[in-house]
Amino acid sequence: MTNHEQVLTDYLAAFIEELVQAGVKEAIISPGSRSTPLALMMAEHPILKIYVDVDERSAGFFALGLAKASKRPVVLLCTSGTAAANYFPAVAEANLSQIPLIVLTADRPHELRNVGAPQAMDQLHLYGSHVKDFTDMALPENSEEMLRYAKWHGSRAVDIAMKTPRGPVHLNFPLREPLVPILEPSPFTATGKKHHHVHIYYTHEVLDDSSIQKMVTECTGKKGVFVVGPIDKKELEQPMVDLAKKLGWPILADPLSGLRSYGALDEVVIDQYDAFLKEAEIIDKLTPEVVIRFGSMPVSKPLKNWLEQLSDIRFYVVDPGAAWKDPIKAVTDMIHCDERFLLDIMQQNMPDDAKDAAWLNGWTSYNKVAREIVLAEMANTTILEEGKIVAELRRLLPDKAGLFIGNSMPIRDVDTYFSQIDKKIKMLANRGANGIDGVVSSALGASVVFQPMFLLIGDLSFYHDMNGLLMAKKYKMNLTIVIVNNDGGGIFSFLPQANEPKYFESLFGTSTELDFRFAAAFYDADYHEAKSVDELEEAIDKASYHKGLDIIEVKTNRHENKANHQALWVKIADALKALD
């Protein structure tokens, strides 16, 4: 044992122990040499749960999914060099979707920076504005002052990551060789006795009485709507429904709002606005005086377009993290306040005669017509097209299941075809940067928390993150993946690019002609190709009770999918015109 080894051990033990005391329970480690002491010390910790992922990009998204589902800070650790750069997509997503990640990158010591040393690059501020905070840690020392320094930075990292708005932080550790710490006796048997831990307390932002009364006055007796985008706070669901009923306002609920699948059916929850807000005649009849928006912007483009064209209204955005989530620049009142506090205080102060019944009836009538058409069309069709896949998932998913939703077409199909249901289905997606990368790994991370967990994903997105399946094989994780294989970029069929046939297939359609049964075999997954509705039902039913990785592939046609969507919209439009 050398003094260097003791210094290294004491310094890193103080830091890691404080991470755990502050609330970290899991660490995702990407193997490497320079990160050896941190990896060994984390593995040695008696409480910390370790996952090892050899692909850094997959590791980043696995940590993201785990942190998203658990709402706890999760640690990421990698060696020096380009390994850290591979975390960048997950870090960017964590920043935009406010997920607490603590990214630890090992680095060469200062004397080996910018001198051509192997596996060394500039890692200072590597993630730029995509992290809430960056620290280039001091070289290890074990004086009392430096042990307090290491401990302090452990607490601070968790605090910053968890403080509203939540997000990623980055700590860079320069480390000199030799890199192996002392593990016998365990470095964690005495650290708690040597140092007091930092206790972290969080508060909720509230509004002053005058602001509350002003908002109540502005909303009383007015025609208003709640718009609820992606927001993962189940404690808001029932209070929001209760307030909407008291006001007589509809709730335009994105699939990721939680309100379509929180275990109850409420007519104030509007789930088919994407269909009827396309119609100019209906839009003219649905002009609110007040909008209160919670969460990020919903996925629906017709809803976005409708909100953009509203004028001379009061438009509240409730944003406790001060992130200014207002891409359409419509806000008149930015409310930096805890959402639950606002709902409760408005409920308490709102008079009982505050609602306009006719206003709500208009919304619920249109929604009922559109929903009944969607449900009837899906019940009557025997063709296993993309909408039918979502409808079958809605019908077959067991109560309290989790559903991770891929970007591009899957989230939009869920918006259209996953109507409100009286089961509790936890829906998750990466809707910060909205990328198609890392979705498999994110779903696997979430599966650590939610069971049973299902993933609905497109073929290109699945291909993009097949490496993530190694975690399922290695740790025997339970996940059912439903691949909607339309052989390419199906969403582009709905976009203006589809009108340029000369280059459409080569640049946007991007057919791969991959057969995913071989990927399933490679990662020891049970594979099912569903060619009919009955086969899909059988595969989902089997997967619901099977422990392990299941891959269900459904091959669809991009052109038919577009035609089916358009036919559905026409049918809904005709029915709504007849209603008037």
Curated annotation (Swiss-Prot):
- Listed GO MF terms: 2-succinyl-5-enolpyruvyl-6-hydroxy-3-cyclohexene-1-carboxylic-acid synthase activity; magnesium ion binding; manganese ion binding; thiamine pyrophosphate binding
Q: Does the keyword Transcription regulation apply?
A: no
Key words, A-Z: Magnesium, Manganese, Menaquinone biosynthesis, Metal-binding, Thiamine pyrophosphate, Transferase
Q: How is the cofactor bound?
A: Binds 1 thiamine pyrophosphate per subunit.
Alphabetized InterPro entries for the sequence: DHS-like_NAD/FAD-binding_dom, MenaQ_synth_MenD, MenD_middle, THDP-binding, Thiamin_PyroP_enz_TPP-bd_dom, TPP_enzyme_TPP-bd
SUPFAM superfamilies hit by this protein:
DHS-like NAD/FAD-binding domain (SSF52467), Thiamin diphosphate-binding fold (THDP-binding) (SSF52518)
Tell me the enzyme class.
Answer: transferase
Which reaction is recorded as catalysed by this protein? isochorismate + 2-oxoglutarate + H(+) = 5-enolpyruvoyl-6-hydroxy-2-succinyl-cyclohex-3-ene-1-carboxylate + CO2
What EC number(s) does this enzyme carry? 2.2.1.9
Name the chain's protein: 2-succinyl-5-enolpyruvyl-6-hydroxy-3-cyclohexene-1-carboxylate synthase
List the taxonomic lineage: Bacteria, Bacillati, Bacillota, Bacilli, Bacillales
